[in-house]
């Protein structure tokens, strides 16, 4: 019996297994003479055991019978060498307005903004002055790559359907044609198949093309997804790593310098991270008051975009719940506006 992407199948115990894992435990585990289970990311974000996998005792480390890592694949000419570019800003202004009152704070980086203000990563992903410079970097790199490989293409991973439409409009404003494919797209697989052999330069995806989809001409990726798990991040990066010829030896991924994603990027050379491929005791998830990745009631709208460069755009955030400010016994919502200076900086992480 052969399994691909075995990490989707969870569980050693039927009570802690998912539906796919239960089928393996009930129908395969004691019947197959030999099993071959494959995965490029052999761990699960919920920390559950992978079905049929073996773990050391008492450490709980995954025991692999054979490893063929990214470095091996690059050496053999099977995969491209990843180049990851993180976009940051050295002067981010946050303006808080409440009625006639306003206050301004400056942050030296996006990490500081996210760590010390109510602004969330997902809200930043909808800011035109985050979307545009990341797309522009990807577009410039794709232009360069197509000088050598004329059919090279780019992938943009979006957060949800409206976000994908916003990104598509931005690409069109740059003179680029693109396709949009989401988990709601009728005949989505046909759209992907058509793009695979077309001359279209860009495809914008939501919930698609992150795993198991082979489009070898993809060589550039702009990561604008709100998902910040290492499994998803590596699966997306894998979409641009497939090498097809002598001259396409590099893959490029562009993203915001968000601390969690930066940590994933910095250890992409580690094929089996020790803190991930470990069997842990699984607990029922509880409320985490620190997490602000998807604030309830958050509304986002673009307010007057000024200028055409990298600065001048502002984004308003109506933050509710824990961010309500009380004045005279009446709750009112502060409005936060973020603006970026032209002092963008790029950090390049090169692997192998």
PLM feature segments, named:
Residues 40, 159, 207:
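Conserved H-loop
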Residues 1-37, 41:
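SF2 helicase catalytic motif II
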């Amino acid at each position: 019996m052969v399994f691909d992407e075995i990490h989707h199948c969870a569980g050693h115990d039927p009570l802690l297994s998912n539906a796919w894992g239960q089928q393996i435990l009930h129908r395969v585990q004691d019947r197959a003479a030999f099993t071959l289970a494959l995965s490029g990311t052999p761990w699960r974000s919920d920390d559950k055991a992978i079905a049929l996998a073996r773990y050391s005792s008492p450490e709980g480390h995954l025991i692999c019978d054979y490893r063929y890592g990214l470095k091996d694949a690059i050496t053999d000419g099977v995969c491209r060498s990843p180049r990851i570019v993180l976009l940051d800003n050295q002067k981010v202004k946050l303006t808080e307005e409440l009625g006639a009152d306003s206050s301004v704070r400056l942050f030296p980086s996006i990490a500081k903004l996210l760590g010390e203000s109510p602004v969330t990563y997902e809200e930043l992903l909808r800011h035109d002055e985050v979307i545009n410079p990341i797309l522009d970097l990807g577009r410039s790199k794709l232009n360069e790559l197509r000088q050598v490989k004329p059919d090279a293409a780019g992938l943009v991973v979006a957060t949800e359907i409206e976000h994908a439409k916003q990104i598509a409009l931005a690409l069109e404003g740059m003179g680029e044609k693109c396709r949009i494919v989401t988990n709601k797209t009728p005949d989505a697989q046909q759209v992907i198949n058509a793009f695979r052999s077309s001359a279209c330069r860009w495809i914008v995806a939501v919930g698609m093309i992150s795993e198991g989809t082979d489009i070898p001409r993809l060589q550039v990726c702009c990561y604008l997804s709100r998902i910040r798990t290492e499994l998803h991040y590596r699966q997306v990066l894998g979409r641009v790593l497939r090498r097809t010829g002598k001259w396409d030896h590099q893959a490029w991924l562009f993203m915001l310098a968000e601390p969690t994603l930066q940590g994933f990027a910095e250890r992409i050379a580690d094929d089996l991270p020790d803190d991930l491929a470990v069997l842990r005791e699984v607990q029922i998830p509880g409320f985490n008051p620190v997490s602000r990745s998807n604030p309830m009631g958050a509304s986002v709208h673009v307010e007057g975009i000024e200028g055409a460069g990298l600065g001048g755009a502002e984004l308003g955030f109506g933050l509710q719940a824990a961010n309500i400010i009380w004045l005279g016994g009446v709750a009112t919502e502060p409005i936060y506006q973020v603006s970026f200076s032209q002092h963008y900086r790029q950090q390049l992480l090169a692997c192998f």
